[in-house]
C-alpha cells in the first residue's frame, strides 16, 4: 500500500502534526539513589517564596513556622506566596454571587456524604505513610495498623464503621499524653550454620508494643513522607512528591469532596471531568468567548503556566476558603472541614534516606541518615549540598525532618486549589475597563481568554489578571505563558485549533505489550487502539499500522511467530508441531502461532470469541478446559482492569474484556518478601481473603448492600446461616438431624 505521506496533511491544520513531534517511545527516566536532595530543595524553595512572612515557633512541636498570608505585596515579577486573605474572600464572594446557592448545596452534599462514608473509604489509595513503622505501606495496611494501635489506647471509633467516629478518634489521639502502638522489631538469633562452620544470624520479625510521647506522636501524625517522582519526561531534574499519613487522609477526603461538588458546577473548571467530557466543556468555553467578542474587536487566548503552583499556595488560604464556603453549615461540619488545612499548616516533611559521602581517599562510602546531617562537619559534603544544608538549618528538626508550614505538597487539594484558580478567572474585569476575561482551570494548568476592542486593551486585561493572581498567591509565569488569537491554544495537553487536534502520540508508550499474560495483553493492546480511534482522533490508516506493529511486538515478546515462519527456537518447535497437526489453522490464537485476523471492524471482540468457530474441536477443548488449575477462571470472567501509562499524566485504569483460556495464567508472588518484616502483612492479607471467601459463600452477590448498622461480619454470617437452615428444614430440604447439628455448630461459635 503506497501512500504519499504528504496527502495525510492536506486540509489539516499544522497543529495536527503534533503527533509526529512527540514520539515518546523509550523508557522514561527513573530516579535512583537518595531523594533527600530533592526534598531539601522543595523545603528551601517553599520558604524562599514566603520568607517575608511572619515567623514564629509552634507551641506544640517546637518547629519554626512561617505565615506568608497578608505579607508584603510584590514589587517585581518574581514568584511570591503572599496571598491577601481579604482578596481571596472577596473573590469567593463574587463566585457566590454568580452561582447563588452553589456553596450551600456543595456543603450540604459533602456533609450528607460524610455521614454515610465508612472507614473503608480510606483503604482506597496507594502508598500511605504509616506512623507505626515510619515508612510507606499500602493504604489498607496503614489503616489497619492505625486502628489496631488505636484500640490499645481505648479509641474504638473505627468499630462503629463510620468515618466520623474514626476521625473523632484521631482528634482524641492528639490529646493523649502518650500513645501505645504495635510496631515490628527484628530479633536477631544466632543459629549454627548447617553446611559450613560458624553461625548464621537469622532475623525474626516480632510484633511488639511500643510507646511514644504526645509530642512525638503529633510529629508523626503531621509527617509527610517524601519520595522522588519517577518516570517524568521532558525535565532534566527530578522533583520530590509527598505521601500523607492516615491521620490527615480522612480530613483531606472530605474537603476535596466539598471542592469537587463546587468544581462540577463551575463551567471554568477542568476537574473532575476528563476525556471527551472535558473537551466538550472546553469547546463550549471557546464558543462562548467568541460569541461575546465585541464587533470589530479581538479575542486572545493565553496558554498559561504557573510558577511553582503548589509551593506558593498556603494552607491558611485553604482554611479561609473552607470557612467561607461552609459559612451556612452546622458548626461541627465547619470545624471538621477546618482540620485538614490546620494540619497542613503544621506539616513536617521527612527527608528520606540521607546523603552518601565518601572518605577523602575515595575508598570508603557511608550513608549519613537524616538525623545526623548536621552532626558531621559540613566540609565533608560537596559544595552544592553544603549550600543546601546551610539554608535548611533554621527549619531542621533533630529527628531528621524539616518544618514546612507554607506551601502544599503535590497531589493534595487539587480540587480546592482549582476553586481558587477559578475564583481568579471569575473576576472577569477590574475597574470597569474595556476588556473581559474568562478561562479554564485544572489544578495548576490554565487557559485565559480575553476579549477587547483592540490588542493593547487585551494586553491590559492580561496584565490585570496577572496582578489579580498575585493577590491570591498564584504566580502566572510571564516567560512560559504565550498568547495567540482565540482558536489556538493548549490546555492539559489537549491542543486546540478550531477544534481539538488529534493527539495520540501521548498514548504511544502504552501501545506496547502490557506484560500481564498472553490473553490479557492481546485484549489490552486492541482496546487501546480502539480507544484511541474513539477518543484521540487516530485515523484508520494509523490504526491499521498500529495493529500490525502491535502484533509484531506481541510475537517477539512471547516468541510465538506464525507456525509457517522460519523463526527457530524452543517455543517455535512446539508451535510448528501444533501447526502441522491442526486443520483449522485460522483458529489458532496468535500466541499459539496462528495468523492475526484483527482489523478495524473487529477490534472490540476478544480473540478467543473471534476465532471460536474456526478452531479444531480438540484444540478448543484444550484451550478452554474448565478444570485447568493454572487458570484463575473466577478472576478473569467478564471485565478486567489494567493500568495504562501514557507519556503524560497519571497512570490510567482501563477496562478490557477477556475470556479465560490456557493463556490467562497468573504469576506467583515474589517469594523474597517472606523473609522480611512485611511477612505479617502477607499473612494478614491471606487471612482477610479467607474471611471474604467465607462471607461470599454465605451471601450470594445479589444480596450485597452497602453496610449500614453495627453488625460484625461474624454476626451477619451466623444470622444468615440460621435463616437458611430454618428455611431448608421447614421446606423439607434438610433433615431434622442435620438441622440440629447446624444449630449446635452455630451455638459453639456463640451465636444462637
Curated annotation (Swiss-Prot):
Query: What biological function has been recorded for the protein in this entry?
Result: RNA-dependent RNA polymerase which is responsible for replication and transcription of virus RNA segments. The transcription of viral mRNAs occurs by a unique mechanism called cap-snatching. 5' methylated caps of cellular mRNAs are cleaved after 10-13 nucleotides by PA. In turn, these short capped RNAs are used as primers by PB1 for transcription of viral mRNAs. During virus replication, PB1 initiates RNA synthesis and copy vRNA into complementary RNA (cRNA) which in turn serves as a template for the production of more vRNAs.
Query: Could you tell me which residues belong to the region Promoter-binding site?
Result: 249-256
Q: Which GO terms describe its molecular function?
A: nucleotide binding; RNA binding; RNA-directed RNA polymerase activity
Q: What happens to this protein after translation, modification-wise?
A: Phosphorylated by host PRKCA.
**Name the UniProt record assigns to this protein:** RNA-directed RNA polymerase catalytic subunit
Q: How does it assemble?
A: Influenza RNA polymerase is composed of three subunits: PB1, PB2 and PA. Interacts (via N-terminus) with PA (via C-terminus). Interacts (via C-terminus) with PB2 (via N-terminus); this interaction is essential for transcription initiation.
Motif stretch (Nuclear localization signal): 187-195, 203-216
Where's it found, cell-wise?
Host nucleus; Host cytoplasm
Which keywords, in A-to-Z order, does the entry hold? Eukaryotic host gene expression shutoff by virus, Eukaryotic host transcription shutoff by virus, Host cytoplasm, Host gene expression shutoff by virus, Host nucleus, Host-virus interaction, Inhibition of host RNA polymerase II by virus, Nucleotide-binding, Nucleotidyltransferase, Phosphoprotein, RNA-directed RNA polymerase, Transferase, Viral RNA replication, Viral transcription
Describe the location of the RdRp catalytic domain by residue ranges: 286-482
Entry-linked InterPro entries: RNA-dir_pol_NSvirus, RNA_pol_PB1_influenza
Say which family it is in: Belongs to the influenza viruses polymerase PB1 family.
Keyword Phosphoprotein in record: yes
A cellular component term, taken from the record's GO annotations: host cell cytoplasm
Q: Which Pfam families match?
A: Flu_PB1 (PF00602)
The Gene Ontology biological process terms listed for this entry are: DNA-templated transcription; symbiont-mediated suppression of host gene expression; symbiont-mediated suppression of host mRNA transcription via inhibition of RNA polymerase II activity; viral RNA genome replication; viral transcription
In short, the EC number is 2.7.7.48
Catalytic activity from the UniProt record: RNA(n) + a ribonucleoside 5'-triphosphate = RNA(n+1) + diphosphate
